[in-house]
Amino acid sequence: MEERRLFKPSIEYTEQIAEYKAEFSPEQIRATYDPDRIPGMDYLENYNSIPEWLCFLDTVKGKITWHMSVWMSDGKIIGFCCLRHKLEYDDDDPDFASNVGYSIRPSERRKGYAKEQLRLVLQEAKRLGMDHVRIICRDINIGSNRTILANGGKFVDAIYGEESGMTVHRYDVPIS
């Protein structure tokens, strides 16, 4: 497996970010808790352009950190992730709050990249002084459930969202 690193999204990656986003169909997003968002790219749907979204990212520095996981050999974006420094920042029902959101480009799935990307995000959380993170995923998202468990996630519970009609699994992941 080639080396991947996390990079902060920037204007230089505008075209690659657009290509990444375009690869997601409604069917692929439906497996997530919020079917209007691509995980790890929160709030992109609220902006008319990627540069506008990048400006938004600057406004939440210190609360949320976004990263792209990138192939070092060719600069291809294989994943996006965000690390929410505090659960109370989440604007949804607090029971459904999550410190981490992530996605892998559909054409690059089932290759172990999500596991590696989450490992890198946990290193970033440790650097920020966090001792654990809470992560949620839909009960039907087998890949995400496995990724979280592979990174030391401890199953907390399954909760049903009355408004969304979805069941999610909640995990706590200790950071060592």
Predicted regions and their residues:
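Short secondary-structure boundary/hinge segments and terminal tails
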Residues: 126, 143, 166-167
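Loop/helix-junction capping segments adjacent to catalytic residues or to phosphate/diphosphate-binding pockets
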Residues: 14, 111, 142
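GNAT-family acyltransferases
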Residues: 1-99, 106, 164-176
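Conserved acetyl-CoA-binding loop-helix of GNAT-fold acetyltransferases
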Residues: 102-104, 110-123, 127, 146-150
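Conserved catalytic-core motifs of GNAT/GCN5-like acyltransferases
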Residues: 136-137, 152-170
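Conserved beta-strand-loop-alpha-helix junction that forms the acyl-donor binding cleft
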Residues: 135-145
